Amino acid sequence: TGQVVLAGEVKSNTYLDVQQIARDVVNAIGYTKGAYQFSGDSCGVISLIHEQSQDINQGVDRATKEEQGAGDQGMMFGYASKETENYMPLALDISHKILEELAAMRREGTEISYLRPDAKAQVTIEYSDDNVPQRIDTIVVSTQHDPFLEEDAAMLATIKKDIIEKLIPRVVRLFPPHVQALF
């Protein structure tokens, strides 16, 4: 659609050029080419930001940060895990690292030059009966890319080869030996 929609409630005495900030973020993510049909330089930016309700603001504004309220809150759930130093479940941590490295490779533009912004990854780990990771069963990576070969099967084969031979080794090096052994 070529649109960015900003929505929410804000209480501030500062002017922010939210349209330009949104465009800068879209460009920083990597949407910079007309071929993507979405670019920070040409997208529409719709701002639905309005002043925070007085009722919520009364619960938030305090003289010190120790007294600061949380305002309007969303609900979420999750859990911490001792599988990783950052307390994220191991499969999610590996997925995040895959996407971080894929984005770094896209920005570098040298090893895999056809990558576009927007990707997702999923990792499935096989566990023993006592919940000890045994091996990585499956890694799925889906990424937007430039069309670089005429035949789809050849393009898919190249992408798969690059993910396995170029991306995954970079990811493996980020982990301690006991996690590297799972790959």
Residue ranges and their predicted role:
Residues 12-26:
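Active-site-surrounding "flap" and adjacent substrate/cofactor-binding loops of secreted or lumenal enzymes
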Residues 1-12:
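Short, charge-patterned binding micro-sites
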Residues 2-3, 25-183:
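Glycine-rich, mobile lid/loop segments that gate access to catalytic sites or pores
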